[in-house]
Every structure is written in C-alpha cells, then in structure tokens.
C-alpha cells in the first residue's frame, strides 16, 4: 500500500491554493472550449437557420457578438487543443459564410478574423488555405490579407511536415498574380512551390512550376499566362462568385465565350494572343 501521509512539498498555508489553481485552470479550459465551439458561449449570435430572413439590426448585433468572440479566441490560450479549436473555428466560419441573409446585411468583413484564429492554431492544415483564398480574396475582396495570413502559415510549414505544402505557395502565387498584380512576387512563390514539390509524390509538377515562374520573370505582363491561370481558377471551383469573376476577367483579356446546348461554356483564346507572346520571347 502506498503511503500518502508524507509531508507536503508546499509551505503550510499554500497547499490549499493548489486545488483552487487546478480548478481555475479547468474552468478556463471549459470556457475556452465553449468559446471555440461552433455555437460559441451561449451561442455566437449567428442566424441558426440561414434560410430565414433577418433584420439589419439583428444581423449587426450578431456581427458584433461574433466580432467580440473572435477577439477573445485570438487572446485565449489553446491549452493543448490547438487542432480541435482550429476545427471548431472553421465550422463557425462555415456557418457565418453560409448565412446568406445575414451577409447581405453585414457583408463578409469577419472572414480574415476566422482564418487568423485557424492559422494561429493549426498552420499546417494545408487544405484550409484554399478556403482562405476563396473567401477572403474574393468575398471579402482582401487578397492582401490572404497573402499575409498565408505568409504566417508558411513559417510553420515545410515539405517534410506535409508533402502537399507546396500547394500553399501555389495558392499564394495565384493570388499575387491575378488579384494583386504582383508578377515578381508570384514568380518567387511559384519558384518556392517548385522547390517544395521536389522529392514528394507531386514532383512531376516541379518543372512546370519552375517554367511558370521563369515565364513571369521574363515577361511580367504575359497575357497568355493570365488567361490560362484564370481558366484554371474557373475550372477548379464551383463557387458562383469566383466563376463570375473569372469570366469577367477572361472577357477583359479578350477571350471569347460561347454557351453550348448543355449549358457548359466554351472558352476561345484569340489566335493573335499566342502569336503576340511568341514574338516577345
């Protein structure tokens, strides 16, 4: 039998504080977990039924409550639940993002706040960065914030930690090229994507990424590259807003668009586009 009557290691009078401290930490953990949960602490104030109409006043109040909750989430310690808290914050983001009636009243100004919390607690979650780009760059119209958050996340990423990490550099490079108009930054990002793709199951992408980067460095205003990249954006998403933006940009770049009998779109790149680019080489 173990003897539990040994002398306490705490000075007399302080030992009583130990269970209080433990209880305090437990309480903080519970409160923190409730705050991170999709419903928040006594609910986040978001519309629980996104199909219902909501008044402008109610939408603003819900937005203010969610703003306050997200500020707390940025300050509270994770207490070892980083991945779980990032997951719950992502679920809250989905609820906020999908609440169309409320977003019509308040717009999407909290999107970067959700992803700041997520990137802080789980920066190695590679798949999350696509949602970051689509939502913050297109819906919130802040690709600059997308790039800033991606740069923070990349500090914790490497191909050794996740073989798909090169995709994050690729996402950054696309936003820099198409939405920020920074061809040189995009070229650097694609060079890094190529470097990180080496010695991974996706190593076949590395030469193409390097070629893409080299083309941008030699011709920052390469029209065909922009057209092909917008076509890639259109074909890899089902999001209506992103597709609408891609179509708009392609039309401005001179691409002809025809609607087939089945409703699918056909994109026709003017022959002179390729000829012009070949002359510049």
Predicted regions and their residues:
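Inward-facing hydrophobic residues that define packing positions of alpha-helical scaffold repeats
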Residues: 108, 115, 150, 189-190, ...
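Short coil/turn connectors between adjacent alpha-helices in alpha-solenoid helical repeat scaffolds
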Residues: 99-107, 137-145, 178-186
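Extreme N-terminal leader/anchor segments
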Residues: 1-78, 82, 266-281
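A conserved position within tetratricopeptide repeats
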Residues: 119, 154-161, 194-201, 234-235, ...
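Amphipathic alpha-helices of TPR/Sel1-like and other helical repeat/solenoid scaffolds
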Residues: 69-78, 96, 104-122, 145-158
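Amphipathic alpha-helical repeat scaffolds of TPR domains
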Residues: 81-99, 122-139, 162-179, 192, ...
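Solenoid-repeat scaffolds in large eukaryotic assemblies
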Residues: 111, 146, 185-187, 226, ...
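Terminal, low-structured helical/coil segments at or just beyond the last alpha-helical repeat
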Residues: 209-281
């Amino acid at each position: 039998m173990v003897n539990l009557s040994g002398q306490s290691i705490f000075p007399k009078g302080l030992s009583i504080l130990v269970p209080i401290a433990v209880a305090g930490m437990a309480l903080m953990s519970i409160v923190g977990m409730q705050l991170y949960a999709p419903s928040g602490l006594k609910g986040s104030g978001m519309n629980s039924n996104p199909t219902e109409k909501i008044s402008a006043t109610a939408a603003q109040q819900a937005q203010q409550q969610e703003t306050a909750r997200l500020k707390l989430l940025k300050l509270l310690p994770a207490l070892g639940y980083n991945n779980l808290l990032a997951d719950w914050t992502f679920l809250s983001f989905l609820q906020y993002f999908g609440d169309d009636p409320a977003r019509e009243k308040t717009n999407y100004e909290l999107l970067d706040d959700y992803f700041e919390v997520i990137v802080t607690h789980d920066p190695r979650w590679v798949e999350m960065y696509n949602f970051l780009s689509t939502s913050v760059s297109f819906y919130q119209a802040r690709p600059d914030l997308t790039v800033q958050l991606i740069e923070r996340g990349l500090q914790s990423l490497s191909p050794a930690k996740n073989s798909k990490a090169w995709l994050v550099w690729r996402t950054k490079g696309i936003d820099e090229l198409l939405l920020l108009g920074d061809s040189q930054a995009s070229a650097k990002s694609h060079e890094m994507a190529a470097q990180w793709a080496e010695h991974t199951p996706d190593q076949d992408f590395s030469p193409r990424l390097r070629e893409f980067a080299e083309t941008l460095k030699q011709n920052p205003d390469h029209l065909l590259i922009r057209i092909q990249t917008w076509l890639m954006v259109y074909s890899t998403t089902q999001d209506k807003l992103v597709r609408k933006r891609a179509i708009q940009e392609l039309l401005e770049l001179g691409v002809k668009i025809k609607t087939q009998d089945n409703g699918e779109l056909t994109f026709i790149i003017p022959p002179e586009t390729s000829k012009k680019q070949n002359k510049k080489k």
